[in-house]
Amino acid sequence: MNNFLSASQVVSLIAAVGDKRTVIVEGENGIGKTALFHMLRKLPKFADHIAVQPIDCTQLSDGSVWMPDLDRENGVSRELPNERFGVSASNQLGVNNSKPILVGLDEIAKAPQFIKNVLAPIIYERRVGNLGMPEGSVVVCFTNLSIEGLGDSIQAHLRNRLVFVK
């Protein structure tokens, strides 16, 4: 029995459920997982989305996702999202004319645990810092098969909130 989906089946699945659940695409090293993101971008369904460039999670560090912004007058701080995620004061949940965002997180399981923790609100809640992604936004992740021994791992308690496909 074949437990693997074709590229077009994976793209169809993401298009169908990606705005409600994050899909993680697992596949062999070099098989073209990131190319699926570019296939998604071309679908008419995503024509009005802001499709950001795929983000290599292994290259993220402190401040790559959001930075603190101090409001000394009110004695508070806020989290300002990095522009690479497509979220801003003028493009966020609840703001008229905001466009949904298509985000691809590449090599998610290879990222250091603290980066996975920082990315968790994006993956599970469609939120960067304090700003929610506009309705219809899609987050899709890509990683290698854990059996390849390339250091890819996602903790079990986090796996049950995601849709995994191969």
Language-model features, listed with the residues they occupy:
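AAA+ P-loop NTPase catalytic core and its hallmark functional loops
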Residues: 1-166
